[in-house]
């Protein structure tokens, strides 16, 4: 009877671990498995070792579950806050912020659909949910993560056009932004559907059913297509666009510095992209770059300096110089003569112009470095391994594989921080969500 009970327990554990019973050996003192045996030829440690065979392993698994659970929670909360802020705060409902809204939705899907199953797989260290769910999970992973990355490309494009084209802000309608969002999700869908339609390596079913490992298709052609579409082409576009944005900011700052040296008074910058102060709005960082470049004086759009005479023209509509994203109108850091002093009397106590402009240039570099650096640092390790493993048939440590995957997921945790922390309007909206409507929105000086 006791042996029958032990055999029943043995059958349950073997069913859970999918181990061939006839090849297992057992201790003579009882029905406890000896996990240090080789089960069958060609099997791996995924089958030959128990998930929590020692107290230390159980503690490690519990710690891992807590850390991953907190990461998932932080990702959900951060993106829900961004979505709620845009939907509930009227002044944040703009065409440009729709890109941030869609990005937050993509990252929220990563947190709700992809990361939980990934956490279970990471803690248990084997896939016991079958090939069908594995196929759905990996395809959903590709869809949501690709959409998240491509949204960053769309935001970079929106920001670049706003910087370089004065008319873009007024042409950036909800319809145009909606088309960008539709393109992002369409491309992401085509990248993920390829695996569901059968673009898999020959060992995919065996890897899931026998090795109990669930990874995306390791077919070389698919990996080249997927990694190029999801990362390598997007990261190249992002780097080029942000480099051009930085060059534009730097050129304007130095142009203003040169004008000051010639005439003694620095004119406000009025480049083709000066309208970025009016609209920007792509998640707050566009507005931060605007602040770096410099806001033009309210109601004054052009100033020409000839010797000691300033001739100002007021031929630009006020909305083009106001900050449509609701940012506070901080006084500029350079003087515009008597008119500027009348608007901002504190200008006479400002730092020397050269130091202020150098600070703006460093801030521009820092802001754009944070955007690109966080994205590249999070996703580059994963995509290097993704293309390296199937092409060279390399053996990569499971720990390294897991770290690179979760570092990529961590980008969905960072996005709501990076793309809103530079915007006072988003920060104030978060305060209103947390503290209620008692927190009043600060208004720019009229």
UniProtKB/Swiss-Prot annotation:
Chain segments annotated as transmembrane: 66-88, 99-120, 136-157, 177-199, 228-249, 368-391, 400-422
Keywords, alphabetical: Cell membrane, Disulfide bond, G-protein coupled receptor, Glycoprotein, Membrane, Receptor, Transducer, Transmembrane, Transmembrane helix
PROSITE patterns the UniProt entry points to: G_PROTEIN_RECEP_F1_1, G_PROTEIN_RECEP_F1_2
Glycosylation sites: 23, 27, 36, 42
Molecular function terms, GO-annotated: G protein-coupled receptor activity
Keyword Transmembrane helix: yes
UniProt name for this protein: 5-hydroxytryptamine receptor
Upper lineage: Eukaryota, Metazoa, Ecdysozoa, Arthropoda, Hexapoda
């Amino acid at each position: 009877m006791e042996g029958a009970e032990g055999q029943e327990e043995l059958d349950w554990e073997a069913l859970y671990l999918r181990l061939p019973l006839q090849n297992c050996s057992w201790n003579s003192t009882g029905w406890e498995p000896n996990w240090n045996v080789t089960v069958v030829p060609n099997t791996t440690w995924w089958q030959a070792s128990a998930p929590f065979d020692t107290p230390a392993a159980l503690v490690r698994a519990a710690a891992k579950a807590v850390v991953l659970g907190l990461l998932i929670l932080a990702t959900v909360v951060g993106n829900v806050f961004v979505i709620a802020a845009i939907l509930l705060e009227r002044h944040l409902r703009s065409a440009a912020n729709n890109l941030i809204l869609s990005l937050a939705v993509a990252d929220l899907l990563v947190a709700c659909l992809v990361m939980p199953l990934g956490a279970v797989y990471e803690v248990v260290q084997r896939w016991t949910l079958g090939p069908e769910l594995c196929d759905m999970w990996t395809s959903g992973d590709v869809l949501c993560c690709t959409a998240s990355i491509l949204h960053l490309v769309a935001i970079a494009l929106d920001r670049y056009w706003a910087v370089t084209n004065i008319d873009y802000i007024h042409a950036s309608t909800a319809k145009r932004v909606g088309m960008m969002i539709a393109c992002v999700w369409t491309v992401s869908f085509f990248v993920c559907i390829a695996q569901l339609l059968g673009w898999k390596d020959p060992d995919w079913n065996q890897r899931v059913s026998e090795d109990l490992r669930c990874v995306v298709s390791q077919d070389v052609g698919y990996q080249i297509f997927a990694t190029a579409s999801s990362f390598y082409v997007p990261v190249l576009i992002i780097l080029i666009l942000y480099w051009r944005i930085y060059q534009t900011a730097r050129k304007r700052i130095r142009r203003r510095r040169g004008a000051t040296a010639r005439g003694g008074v620095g004119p406000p910058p009025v480049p083709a992209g000066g309208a970025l102060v009016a609209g920007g709005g792509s998640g707050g960082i566009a507005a931060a770059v605007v602040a770096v470049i410099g806001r033009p004086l309210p109601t004054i759009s052009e100033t020409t300096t000839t010797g000691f005479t300033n001739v100002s023209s007021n031929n630009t509509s006020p909305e083009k110089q106001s900050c449509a994203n609701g940012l506070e109108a901080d006084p500029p850091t350079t003087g515009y003569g008597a008119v500027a002093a009348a608007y901002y009397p504190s200008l006479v106590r400002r730092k020397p112009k050269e130091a202020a402009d150098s600070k703006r240039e460093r801030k521009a570099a820092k802001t754009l470095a944070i955007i690109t650096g966080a994205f590249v640092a999070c996703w580059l390790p994963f995509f290097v391994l993704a293309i390296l493993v199937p092409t060279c048939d390399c053996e990569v440590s499971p720990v390294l594989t897991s770290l690179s995957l979760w570092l990529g997921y961590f980008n969905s945790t960072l996005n709501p921080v990076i793309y809103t922390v530079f915007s006072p309007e988003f920060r104030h909206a978060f305060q209103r969500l947390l503290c209620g409507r008692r927190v009043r929105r600060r208004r720019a000086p009229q």
